[in-house]
């Protein structure tokens, strides 16, 4: 039997050098680590890792080749009260594995035990890691490096974006390959998108609870192997990495960046009753935030929380991020529940992971976007992230919906959100682009559902409609559900136009949810994380070409307005913005606080957004000059106007002089 050489303690993971494979694994509390390799017949061969440098266990297997399947058995104490849950009867995934063979099914053998260890061996059914070798021709690929001030983000799901697209070949729909297909790239270019933000593509598992209900985790926020691509999105699991990189290369050639939604806050091992896949059995005490009683701090709502203040976990997370940038050429990250990244356990801007990213010559150069909260006390941290980060701006989302759909927002608050929420983000030398403005996202109602439903309808999720937020700030315009009279359809259309205009012509970085530009509906489900079906797949055959054209025209218009593209904070008297009332006069203090919902926003001294968010048709006196409506508002109903615009109820128009 081949003997393991001591090998090297770096880098983490399994790495082929042309002669064999070096294996390394971190565990500060293990007493012994076995490397388990499996031959073509599934026969297991075990080797003790002979090297032990600090907290890194390592060994070198001569003559091992790419394609080798492996896992680990980690020996140590079973002391739940102290946070130790070692169980060598369970085969464990390498946290740095780049490919996984097998499925993460709901099976009792994939659990370690709660109070007492489960000593039944699970190697026969446990997923295995696969050694891979990386050879890829990037040709002349270069990151677009779109300036933040010019960035337009499009949030999409790999499968849902193309699975029903009639112009994409059937055999690649819903895959990484489809992202790089000319039809999809041309669509994104014509729409005006500069960055495609993908929901998680790192390998994830469906929660046992969902599997028992016949559902699956669709969004992917349940990671199990952070260095491995989710194989279900590949035409062939063996070529997933190349398929993904082919798509990125094609998108880059078109000038479109790729941003990955990444989950560094928890793992698919869930709570103490959850499955044992990897980290819990390798070094539970180090990888997770552990309470005094040995249970997990559940600051994520998912059962566990990664301890990103531990030096080894910081190294792991940093290596993961560098891998996606260096190996896959991604252009940035959106961090799910990103407040966890700054926990020490209190949130700090100089937390270890933030510092590591700041000091990294690779990671400090890519786009970084935070979902700036978690569910722990002090978890709402909007505006408090380090300067390198942009942040999801939920202030903008709620203000836009309240202004146009609930009619209960003062003009002053609306204007503040329109101006990149400077009260929140204008600090620590940050720019307006730090505010990622959104009206909708994957989590919540789609834009169409915002104007068709007053209440969530999540019954299909199997939780008796208890899941999902009740704070939607939506308005069904008098009838719950899709369809209705022509008048109802038109009023809903006008509200959609108003919300899109507010999003795409405001200061900050706009993020558009895929499908909103052609009227996609989830039939009132505002938490469709477990709906891998026609509820979430974009139906291109039913897309509204008129709404798509309207959205594209708005994005094109945005790119013509210097005040929105220069990424500088607006200052009084700088010519970037003037706020006027219906008579083209500066608003008084009382009008800002209590005035009617009528407003004129003059941008760069020649683009005018006239707003009438009241229930009545209202005359709006335009500033001096000859004004004409511009696309997407130009038409027979909007000729050249020199003095007054008849503003329809809940309407707006954009003019140029």
UniProtKB/Swiss-Prot annotation:
The keyword Hydrolase applies. It comes from the Bacteria. Belongs to the glycosyl hydrolase 13 family. One of its GO terms (molecular function) is glycogen debranching enzyme activity. This is Glycogen debranching enzyme. The keyword tRNA processing does not apply. NCBIfam families: glgX_debranch, PRK03705.1. SUPFAM superfamilies: (Trans)glycosidases, E set domains. Its EC number is 3.2.1.196. It catalyses: Hydrolysis of (1->6)-alpha-D-glucosidic linkages to branches with degrees of polymerization of three or four glucose residues in limit dextrin. It comes from Escherichia coli O6:H1 (strain CFT073 / ATCC 700928 / UPEC). The record marks 443 as: Transition state stabilizer. Keywords: Carbohydrate metabolism, Glycogen metabolism, Glycosidase, Hydrolase. The active site is at residues 336, 371. Pathway: Glycan degradation; glycogen degradation.
